[in-house]
Amino acid sequence: MSNLEGKVVAVTGAARGIGRAIVKGFLAEGAKVVALDMSWTPSGLSGDDNDDYVKELEVKQEDVLISTVDISDSLSVERSYIAALDKFGTVDTLVNNASLRQRNLFPPTGKITTLETKDSDWEKMFGVGVFGTLKITRRFIQPMIKQNRGSIVTVISGGAMHTAIGGAYVAQRSGSSEGPYQSAKAATLTMMFYLAYEVREYNIAVNTLIPGNSRTTGYDEQNDARRAEGTTPSSSARISMRPEHMVPLTLFLADQDANSGVTGKCFDVTIWNMEHGLGSPKTWRDPDADPA
């Protein structure tokens, strides 16, 4: 029997992409899932063009709570939190996966320079990625504090933490043109490092993970737009992977606690998968993605 059998896991950004894969992964392990997202209506974009997934969750309604939430709104978060406790009585793990993608804020390519942005662009990005993550965490961590055990897993981005190889720590910008998005992820990473230290006394593990290059909702449209303007969508070294490559490490971290497990760490999912015999990016390659 899985250690996650019967555990209650809340997942933000659960309707599509990485969140969808994570929800399915937890259900396969026998966990009960609070699936949180701002919209459960298919967007029609690549990877999100039918409602079969929602129907699949509705069949498992004893083990799943589908909840519509705007994590940047405290009242919306509170409503979802109350609904989760009413249905399952507690929360054992929170997976912070929701964010505002740059391609949604600056369609269709997601590219913009710092001087081209407006204050409102940064406020929207940080409102979801940083303050939204804080609001949902601050609320859903309460049952974990009460039961003296829990786990917080937060998805960031490789662009949030870049270092040069050679011994000395040297910070550098991400290779992407996604300043607001990567800045929000960097702020979230720092926040989670501090939170891990602060809630260790409650036996709550707090960890972050960096996804590989994932083919998520709108990925194809973004690459088409970048190709149309003469920008190479991805280098030959980057392989577009299925969101499912995120699942094994997420499941592992969900079962951690601060006293006997791993906490305060940031993991590169691709490297972790290879180290644990789960394959290289080629193993997880999406056959329908752009050829690499």
List the predicted regions and their residue ranges.
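Short-chain dehydrogenase/reductase
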Residues: S2-F88, L100-T113, T117-D121
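Conserved Rossmann-fold SDR core element
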Residues: F26, T90-D92, I152, L189-M192, ...
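A short helix-coil junction within the Rossmann-fold of NAD(P)-dependent oxidoreductases
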Residues: E29, K87-F88, R101-L105, R139-S151, ...
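A glycine/serine/threonine-rich, flexible loop-to-helix segment
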Residues: G44-D49, P108-I112, I165-Y169, E201, ...
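Catalytic loop of short-chain dehydrogenase/reductase
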Residues: R101-N104, E116-D119, S151-E201, N213-S214
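A short, exposed helix-loop element centered on a Lys and neighboring polar residues
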Residues: T137-R138, F193
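C-terminal helical subdomain
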Residues: T208, R226-A292
